[in-house]
Amino acid sequence: MPLPAAAFARILVVSRQRLFNTRIIHTSGSGYSITQCRFYKTTPCLTHKQSQILDLDAPKSRENREKDGGKSKKSKKSIKWSTGSVLMLTIPVFAFSLGIWQTFRLKWKLDLIEHLKGRLNQTAQELPEDLSCESLEPLEYCRVTVTGEFLHEKEFIISPRGRFDPGKKTSAAAGSMLSENEMSSHGGHLITPFRLKNSGKIILINRGWLPSFYFDPETRQKTNPRGTLTLPAIVRKTEKRPQFVGQNVPEQGVWYYRDLNQMAKHYGTEPVLLDAAYETTVPGGPIGGQTNINVRNEHLNYLTTWFTLTLVTMLMWIHKFRK
């Protein structure tokens, strides 16, 4: 039964606010009551004729329905699992596992480098009589002592080579033939055959670094030690030809890299080379201590690559298969 107009005149309409539900609103003189009414936003009104009384139990506005619908859609997003999504997921998983593996490899390589550096400070031992590769390979970067004499007439130079001795960034030692401004990397390593006293075998000794303007033997005759002597040195192995480096030309005395077998064959020595220790440096002579622990370590670049690939492929996978 519809309410008479007089009943609506007693209903309080509040402008520009959404009110709470009220249980009972009584009207005087009519005997009617309204239960569980909902009040919504209305425009200001002076009389019941101007009032925009919203009907009972009115549905939600379109704006509210759209907002609620958007929230429900967002909350319902999930992964669209299928055979294709599972197969594509193996790409970031595989890349992540390789990144973890390279992390362990990096730690192993850093520990190896520290171990090799520690060998340089160990107590020197006698060079074994067995000079085979199998015997000397475990001694790489180990300190040894040798006794014998240099064969200066057969010396040669590997160049270009940089300096690696501890005194590279310090001033030249007193009496050295190098001034502070000459302590650059533009030079080479002086290799001199060395005849062992006990066995008579001839090995190769890297006496140290020389600047290029001292390559001529006539400029350093007074720096060549004579007679029998004992010196500490570091065991080294042969090296492969670096990329973009030319081939050695033994007939012309041109050496770019340390090929022990080629050197031994040309000069009639054993395929053994030792780096003279830094303390063997003589005033005005080559600078010893040119041992550079050069262990290839690209694991940091590898793990960065794999983890980056993991992130990119995972974001692509989520974008494609999340619905």
From Swiss-Prot:
InterPro entries: Surf1/Shy1, Surf1/Surf4
Mitochondrion as UniProt keyword: yes
Skewed-composition ranges (Basic and acidic residues): 57-71
Subcellular localization, as worded in the UniProt entry: Mitochondrion inner membrane
GO biological process: mitochondrial cytochrome c oxidase assembly
GO CC field: mitochondrial inner membrane; mitochondrion
Transmembrane stretches, start-end: 81-101, 299-319
Highest taxon of the lineage: Eukaryota
PROSITE patterns with a match to the protein in the record: SURF1
Pfam families to which the protein is assigned, alphabetical: SURF1
UniProt key word Transcription regulation: no
Main location: mitochondrion
Keywords annotated in UniProt: Membrane, Mitochondrion, Mitochondrion inner membrane, Transmembrane, Transmembrane helix
Region (Disordered): 57-76
Record's bilayer topology term: Multi-pass membrane protein
Family per similarity comment: Belongs to the SURF1 family.
Function statement: Probably involved in the biogenesis of the COX complex.
PANTHER family, A to Z: SURFEIT LOCUS PROTEIN (PTHR23427), SURFEIT LOCUS PROTEIN 1 (PTHR23427:SF2)
Protein name, per record: SURF1-like protein
The organism of origin for this protein: Caenorhabditis elegans
